Swiss-Prot record:
Top-level class of the enzyme under EC nomenclature: transferase
Protein known as: Probable LIM domain-containing serine/threonine-protein kinase DDB_G0287001
EC number: 2.7.11.1
Organism: Dictyostelium discoideum (Social amoeba)
Pfam family name, one: PK_Tyr_Ser-Thr
Coiled coil start-end: none
Domain LIM zinc-binding positions: 4-63, 64-122
UniProt similarity note: Belongs to the protein kinase superfamily. TKL Ser/Thr protein kinase family.
Entry keywords, A to Z: ATP-binding, Kinase, LIM domain, Metal-binding, Nucleotide-binding, Repeat, Serine/threonine-protein kinase, Transferase, Zinc
């Protein structure tokens, strides 16, 4: 053997000496040891300085350590918020289950989407969204220091409680420690009040507070020993650090401008309630005057038959008008609240509609121009126009609240700087696309407008679909779904996607969770275009469940196009017929490997052959062989028609 230099000490290794050859290098036997533990090596890893390290020492020195258990990670690594975890250690701080879908990061803890979407504990003190104070005409009463508000006649069991941070349990209808909500004799025996919070509570006797009646005047913080504190920016809400809980969505109210707006809103509400009562009284007087005129008027001269008919008609009016006066006012009030007309808003860019612009430009070019020039094409809503309700969904970018806008139930999607994936540019993109997409299309939710007054707190308002997502429906095995209904849902989704692709919009996040189902089983596609410009690694980190719907070419670094939406639709088709989660019981981080290998969910044995063929065509490995949504719509129509013919023959 030729003479060589030692790979460690660089001195000559004599042919007759004890030596070790590894790869193309030769070592003295005494040099072929681990630099750290000094043990003889069976295998090694060369460090940056050229020294040799055994596998065990390499793991100790260089392997990533789990943020939770602090042990080296030698298998699948889960990365979130710059922290690394073992797959089994990445679990929810609330339910302690392994997080397989999206998560919510609050105060150093990770929570699964299920726990984050649950209603918060009623005993916790939280700051409500700014519009949670009811608008005029809503049941309930808004409270402020030193302000007396007559409870409206339609008041229900919703009350508001004002208490201190120091004694959240000191509420009683008969005095005691804390502040009293009753109108007689509430005594404050505690320390001076420095900050207050307004809570919405359901009158279930949890606080032993009596529900105000229609004739009750609520006077807050009446005290025999202290004067009523005045509202200021520091007393409208507690500091965020003391009020924040993992399951609550918090909005900072410490801004002086907003504090003044809220104080003005409370006073405005009192005035509007008084105006509403005056209008009702005036309407009552008008109806009574009309009745008096009918009583005093005599029938006009006419033939006997006509006079008889006229008299009968007037008699009927006299007999029925008086008992219905209150009912008419009630119906008028309900109509104004629940059936408010919302005028359709048609966005225009430089005076032209989308249809006109698409004749000469692509949708991407139009969208790029709007975003680059910061052209606002959506209807701008004020906070005062919207009332917030309960949380109905949550994710990395924010939460979705149930709310009321112009008397209609709506969904309010809120983005806040407190959220993990807060991005103003993405918000602008989403509301711009939602404004441009035809809201009259039966398979999209109607978009009403957005608010960007506070750059750290953004929201947009759209139609509320109360029945929930397609995913929820499919996983609820107690709700039977006929094959014809399944075909109808699939056709609705395909029609929505066909429209998007026809104007050049790629969804990029089509999945059962982004499809809402109405009470008559109409499917409405939501969240289109929101994931554009998000790289693959970030998208998988933010929303792990999305990997089930991602086509194999995406994991190879190829870009998004229409065929990626078709692949995702194939997975949704499978979900509709199988009524299961795709890749069930498989770790989300392992799914890309399975997809790249060509593995797909198992199609049920009882799946109709035509439907099965369509699924396979949509999720084929070769993008060019996947059908367009126009072809998919035609195929589903033929399947439905053949099913109808078979029914008629029977």
């Amino acid at each position: 053997m030729d003479t060589n230099n030692c790979g460690v000490c660089k001195t000559i290794v004599n042919p007759g000496s004890e030596r070790v050859k590894a790869g193309t290098s030769v070592f003295h036997a005494k040099c072929f040891v681990c630099k750290e533990c000094k043990n003889e090596l069976e295998s090694f890893i060369r460090s940056k300085d050229g020294s040799l390290i055994c596998d065990e020492c390499d793991i100790k020195l260089n392997a990533r350590k789990c943020f939770k258990c602090q042990l080296p990670i030698q298998s699948t690594i889960v990365t979130a918020r710059g922290k690394s975890f073992h797959n089994d250690c990445f679990n929810c701080a609330s339910c302690e289950k392994i997080i397989k879908g999206g998560f919510f990061f609050v105060e150093g803890e990770f929570y699964c989407s299920t726990c984050d979407a649950k209603p918060s504990d009623k005993t916790k003190t939280t700051t409500p969204p700014p519009s949670e104070i009811p608008l005029p005409g809503k049941s309930g009463v808004s409270l402020a220091n030193g302000v007396e508000i007559q409870v409206p006649n339609n008041s229900t069991n919703i009350i508001y409680v004002l208490n201190t941070n120091e004694s959240s349990n000191g509420l009683s209808s008969s005095g005691g420690s804390g502040n009293s909500i009753s109108g007689s004799g509430g005594t404050n025996t505690g320390s001076s009040t420095s900050s207050f919070m307004i809570h919405k509570r359901n009158n279930s006797n949890e606080l032993n507070v009596v529900t105000p009646t229609a004739t009750t005047t609520v006077d807050l913080l009446t005290s025999s020993t202290t004067t009523t504190p005045t509202l200021s920016p520091s007393t409208l809400s507690p500091p965020i650090s003391t009020a924040r809980f993992s399951n609550d969505y918090l909005i900072s109210l410490q801004d002086d401008i907003y504090a003044k707006q809220q104080q003005q809103l409370l006073l405005l509400q009192q005035q509007q309630i008084q105006i509403q009562q005056q209008l009702q009284q005036q309407q009552l007087e008008i109806l009574q005057k009309n009745q008096s005129l009918l009583n005093s008027s005599s029938p006009s001269p006419s033939t006997s038959s006509t006079s008889s008919t006229s008299s009968i008609s007037q008699s009927q009016n006299l007999n029925t008008s008086q008992p219905n006066i209150t009912q008419q006012l009630s119906n008028l009030n309900i109509s104004n609240q629940k059936n408010g007309e919302i005028e359709k808003y048609i966005p225009k860019i430089n005076g032209k509609t989308l249809t006109e612009l698409l004749k000469h430009q692509s949708f991407d070019d139009i969208l790029g121009e709007v975003l680059s020039k910061k052209i606002s094409i959506y209807k701008e809503l004020s906070k005062e126009e919207v009332a917030f309700g309960d949380v109905i969904a949550s994710g990395a970018s924010g939460k979705v609240y149930k709310g009321i806008y112009k008397g209609r139930d709506v969904a309010i999607k809120v983005y806040s700087s407190e959220n993990f994936c807060f991005n103003i540019e993405e918000f602008d993109r989403e509301v711009t696309i939602m404004s441009l997409i035809d809201s009259d299309h039966p398979n999209f939710t109607r978009f009403y407008g957005a608010n960007k007054q506070n750059k750290k707190y953004l929201f947009h308002v759209s139609e509320l679909v109360k029945s929930g997502s397609l995913r929820d429906l499919l996983l609820d095995k107690e709700k039977p779904l006929a094959y014809f209904t399944q075909l109808s849902i699939a056709s609705d989704i395909a029609n929505a996607m066909k429209h998007l692709h026809s104007i050049g919009v790629i969804h990029r996040d089509l999945k059962s969770l982004n499809v809402l189902i109405t009470e008559d089983f109409t499917a409405k596609v939501i969240d289109f275009g929101t994931s554009r410009n998000v790289d693959l690694a970030k998208q998988m980190t933010l929303n792990l469940g999305t990997s089930c719907y991602m086509s194999p070419e995406l994991f190879k670094g190829n870009g998004y196009d229409e065929t990626c939406d078709v692949y995702a639709f194939g997975i949704v088709l499978w979900e509709i017929i199988a009524r299961k989660e795709p890749y069930e019981n498989i770790n989300s981080w392992s799914i890309p490997v399975l997809v790249a290998k060509g593995e797909r969910p198992t199609i049920p044995a009882d799946c109709p052959s035509e439907y099965s063929k369509l699924i396979k065509a949509c999720w084929t490995d070769k993008p060019k062989k996947r059908p367009s949504f126009k072809e998919i719509c035609d195929t589903l129509k033929k399947i439905s028609e053949s099913l109808t013919l078979k029914r008629n023959k029977k």
